[in-house]
């Protein structure tokens, strides 16, 4: 059975279930599978890259962000920013009186990254991260996981 798009996936699930009373909830099954994939799977097909100009203590994470792989300031790829916990971030700020300088560390906080030291000028940040799998629907009929590994669904 070839499964290459959302409709074929729904049809394959319906065939597997062999119960017409569950047809209406097949999209829910797919959504639950995607939630599990985003929570548990880390695969090269989920890797993404984003850039941003940073000039403040906090910077918003991409909306599809799951987990960092590597962050560095452009032009300094041999010196990636180091991921630290929020408690360690607080200790570093207190010890340095939060003097602005070139960022060396970052922490994850809700939908943002917190940088330390706070940037003293504009820096170009390059971020490699694991991205959420695009949600399948009638308008988004495929994604990298379905195309390359449909059995994960």
Where are these regions (language model features)?
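Glycine-enriched, solvent-exposed interface loops adjoining structured elements
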Residues: 1-153
